């Protein structure tokens, strides 16, 4: 079956949305223009999992979502419509705890002797002899002694006669050799149970000990997701066997790799994965998609960072594109005034670099102490492997490692001991230089040696008296092997630290404008000019033309249209400043006195107002009843978001020890200002009405760019209409697919749907359907076609982005092409009460330069109009007359 990747739709599978539910939507997705379903993880996960990333058995497909038979039914439906399937897989980690994960349970029962011990990234050696050879098991809900005394932790026998340690709803296996001693004279008391548990291959402990004591790599700081050693060939095959079987059987056509930066050797993993899939292509049935296997990696790229050239992948999952879109559609003139407003209202620093460093320091100390200790031990072992470095103390190495890890500005470098590229070398050099300012003079030799190891200098240089192996050394003490192990530990620490410090902390602390705080974006990153956006697109077309282009994901902080609405505030900072200050005065009586302070804190209050702007429904009837209904509908969503935001920020509450008093005060404030007798909802509705036209311009600009820039557009389920969602779980709410199918069947004219905000869902969906139909008619134009920036001049040039996609497959006077125009930063050019469109007088004498080969007659895809384009300067005002975007093809 021939199917060209044109557009994906991400579906979230769980017990409430199964393979059969997805199969019922295939016809709708096909009509919309989707070529591939992009499925969340489908392997057996924890009972009731809502996302599938907590895999318990990689050898089975989840029965909760339909099992193998359900998958086959879905694929059959896809094949009937000539569509493919991309599968999200989780090589980095598995769910752990009790016996729900068979491989983990076997490790707990047998320790290092388990045949599955090599699967998990466990550090079996411990300085404390009593813990050496044991798995730290931080799965108790309370202190170990209290759990034993209360009976929360106890021994029990199941119906089959097997004895377990039972804690809450989890069972932990008892060594076979200990079974005869149990229940011999009746049930053991707490002291006897303690002695028995002390003999096990694991050490049960309170969950709070994980950050300090855990001796296995976690996914971020989650104590129930254990790192998997896919760098081991046997583990790779064991964890991927079913995936390869599904690919060979033609049931899947590509893979999305979750958290690639967690792996020991991401590049090596990608090469091994590519080789295995390519080897299986000849075994695939004729009915399967005939394109090469797609491999897409979840990788957060810092500004200016690129995927390594030697990774054989199609590209990323699209967070980098999201960041570029955000940069393009925010007004650069609003950046510094918004920061000043934040500082004025909150009294907090507005420098993102200060906040990021503080967050990194806090997270490293409170969430990754055990991971830092493992990394320190790895470098200390490297130091001990040679006489020259044996006097580098563990304490000194810890101090300098702490400072360097904090200063690494990207998720990680890529070095497994064989060296790294110039970009990574510059990253390390910068981190070392910045760390030097925090290191005391006595630690500088340790910092210099660490710099040498990280820069790629051999652990033992050629020649010299100490270059020869010392007597009694084993292969395990080989300096190059030790350096490799230390480098891997270092890289597996910087990646989760970056994620937790920025995405899960700073984004909830510092928010001059919340639409900028999105996964893939950098705090305080500058906006993107049209020229810089063009450069990014040209670069993507050259290096990764089949990477995904995302605007929404299951992990986003805010939906694409939430962000586009808030982005308008960057264009009207003075008005926003007056408005938010008036809101604060209006709502001051609803604040709660708490321990001598008023709640909410101004920073939390400012974030709340932005969130309410983002989710408030547009197009309401101008009545109190309509506003009260809307307030009641969004209140639970916003309350859930706010509690999560307060805890993620780790300032006035947190996940470990929530300040329930402060949280309750904030909730009371929210309920008061959104109450039926409050005047605030009317003020909120007034502002949302005010910014809706410019917000819709942003929405259509973002949508058109996603569908026409180099790459494969990925549409997160439900975001084909306006997506005003918040962070999970809000962005994973069920979608009304029947409504969406009805909207599509109505075949709405996009321009006709602009007048009323109530029709904006239909307008966005119609734009998507029409452009995807264009892509279906000429897939190569958008996959391999050149990206040609078009010059715009005149008074409103900054408000237009223009480019062409030009076919490289056909030569001629007028090659197949599409010309794309999108309005941007439209707020100040739209008259009060106007439609989502910059009027002709707003464009004035702005011109777009049409190259000779692209001149001639054109068909406008979104309106059906026929346009004649002459070579040279062409008035923009005559092109953007019905919509704020144009997509036209030569005829």
Locate the predicted segments by residue.
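Hydrophobic or amphipathic alpha-helical targeting/insertion segments
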Residues: 74-123
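ATP-hydrolysis module of ASCE/P-loop NTPase motor domains
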Residues: 142-146, 155, 163, 348-381
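Carbohydrate-interacting/catalytic domains
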Residues: 1-47, 55, 59, 64, ...
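DnaQ-like (DEDDh/DEDDy) 3′-5′ exonuclease domain used for proofreading
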Residues: 122-209
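Short helix/strand-capping turn motifs
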Residues: 105-108, 295, 406
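Alpha-helical transmembrane segments and their helix-helix packing motifs
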Residues: 96, 342-347, 376-377
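Conserved short loop/turn motifs at secondary-structure junctions
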Residues: 92, 257-263, 756
């Amino acid at each position: 079956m021939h199917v060209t990747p044109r557009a994906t739709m991400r579906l979230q599978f769980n017990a409430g949305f199964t393979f059969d539910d997805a199969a019922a939507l295939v016809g709708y997705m096909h009509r919309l223009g989707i070529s591939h379903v992009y499925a969340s993880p489908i392997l057996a996960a924890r009972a009731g999992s809502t996302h599938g990333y907590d895999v318990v058995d990689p050898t089975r497909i989840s029965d909760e979502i339909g099992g193998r038979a359900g998958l086959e039914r879905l694929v059959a439906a896809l094949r009937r419509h000539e569509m493919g399937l991309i599968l999200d897989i989780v090589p980095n980690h598995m769910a752990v705890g009790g016996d729900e994960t068979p491989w983990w349970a076997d490790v707990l029962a047998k320790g290092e002797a388990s045949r599955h011990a090599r699967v998990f990234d466990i550090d079996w050696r411990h300085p404390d002899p009593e813990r050496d050879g044991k798995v730290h098991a931080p799965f108790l809900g309370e202190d170990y002694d209290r759990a034993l005394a209360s009976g929360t932790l106890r021994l029990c026998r199941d119906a089959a006669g097997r004895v377990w340690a039972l804690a809450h709803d989890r069972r932990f296996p008892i060594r076979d050799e200990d079974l005869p001693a149990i229940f011999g004279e009746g049930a053991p008391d707490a002291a006897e149970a303690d002695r028995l548990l002390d003999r096990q291959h694991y050490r049960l402990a309170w969950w709070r000990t994980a950050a300090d004591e855990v001796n296995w790599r976690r996914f971020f700081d989650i104590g129930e997701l254990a790192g998997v050693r896919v760098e081991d060939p046997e583990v790779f095959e064991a964890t991927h066997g079913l995936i390869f079987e599904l690919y060979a059987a033609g049931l899947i056509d590509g893979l999305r790799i979750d958290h690639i930066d967690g792996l020991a050797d991401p590049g090596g993993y990608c090469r091994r994965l590519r080789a295995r899939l390519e080897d299986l292509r000849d075994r695939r049935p004729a009915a399967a998609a005939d394109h090469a296997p797609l491999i897409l990696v979840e990788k957060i790229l810092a500004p200016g960072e690129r995927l390594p050239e030697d990774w054989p992948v199609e590209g990323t999952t699209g967070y980098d594109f999201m960041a570029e879109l955000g940069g393009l559609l925010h007004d650069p003139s609003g950046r510094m005034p918004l920061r000043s407003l934040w500082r004025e209202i909150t009294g907090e620093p507005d420098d993102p670099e200060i906040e990021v460093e503080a967050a990194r320091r806090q997270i490293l100390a409170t969430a990754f102490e055990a991971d830092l200790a493992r990394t320190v031990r790895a470098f200390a072992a490297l130091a001990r492997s040679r006489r020259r470095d044996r006097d580098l103390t563990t304490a000194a190495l810890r101090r300098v490692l702490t400072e360097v890890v904090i200063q690494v500005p990207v998720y990680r470098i890529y070095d497994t001991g064989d060296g790294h590229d110039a970009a990574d070398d510059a990253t390390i050099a910068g981190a070392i230089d910045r760390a030097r300012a925090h290191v005391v003079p006595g630690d500088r030799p340790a910092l210099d040696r660490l710099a040498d190891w990280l820069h790629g200098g051999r652990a033992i240089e050629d020649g010299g008296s100490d270059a020869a192996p010392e007597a009694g050394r084993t292969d395990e003490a080989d300096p190059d092997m030790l350096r490799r192990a230390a480098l891997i530990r270092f890289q597996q620490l910087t990646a989760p630290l970056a994620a937790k410090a920025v995405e899960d902390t700073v984004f909830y602390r510092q928010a001059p404008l919340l639409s900028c705080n999105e996964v893939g974006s950098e705090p305080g990153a500058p906006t993107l000019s049209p020229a810089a956006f063009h450069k990014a697109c040209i670069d993507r077309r050259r290096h990764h033309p089949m990477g995904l282009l995302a605007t929404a994901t299951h992990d986003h902080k805010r939906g694409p249209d939430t962000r586009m609405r808030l982005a308008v505030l960057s264009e009207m900072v003075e008005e926003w400043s007056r408005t938010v200050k008036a809101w604060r005065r209006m709502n001051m009586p609803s604040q709660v006195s708490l321990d001598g302070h008023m709640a909410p804190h101004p920073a939390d209050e400012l974030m709340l107002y932005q969130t309410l702007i983002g989710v408030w429904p547009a197009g309401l009837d101008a009545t109190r009843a309509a506003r009260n209904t809307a307030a009641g509908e969004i209140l639970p969503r916003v309350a859930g978001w706010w509690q999560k935001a307060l805890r993620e920020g780790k300032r006035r509450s947190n996940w470990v020890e929530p300040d329930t008093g402060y949280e309750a005060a904030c909730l009371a404030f929210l309920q008061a200002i959104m109450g039926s007798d409050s005047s605030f909802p009317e003020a909120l509705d007034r502002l949302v009405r005010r910014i809706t036209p410019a917000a819709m311009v942003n929405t259509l600009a973002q949508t058109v760019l996603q569908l026409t820039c180099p790459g494969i557009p990925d549409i997160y389920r439900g975001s084909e209409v306006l997506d005003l969602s918040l962070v999970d779980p809000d962005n994973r709410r069920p979608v009304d697919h029947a409504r969406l199918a009805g909207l599509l069947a109505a075949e709405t004219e996009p321009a006709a749907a602009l007048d009323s905000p109530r029709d904006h869902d239909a307008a966005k969906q119609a734009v998507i359907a029409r452009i995807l139909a264009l892509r279906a008619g000429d897939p190569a134009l958008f996959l391999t076609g050149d990206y040609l920036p078009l010059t715009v001049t005149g008074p409103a040039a900054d408000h237009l982005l223009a480019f062409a996609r030009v076919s490289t497959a056909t030569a001629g006077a007028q090659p197949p092409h599409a010309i794309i125009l999108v309005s941007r930063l439209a707020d100040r050019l739209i008259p009060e009460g106007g439609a989502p469109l910059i009027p002709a007088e707003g464009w004035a004498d702005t011109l777009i330069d049409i190259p000779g080969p692209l001149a001639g007659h054109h068909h406008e895809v979104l309106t059906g109009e026929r346009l004649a384009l002459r070579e040279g300067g062409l008035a923009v005002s005559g092109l953007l007359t019905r919509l704020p975007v144009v997509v036209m093809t030569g005829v």
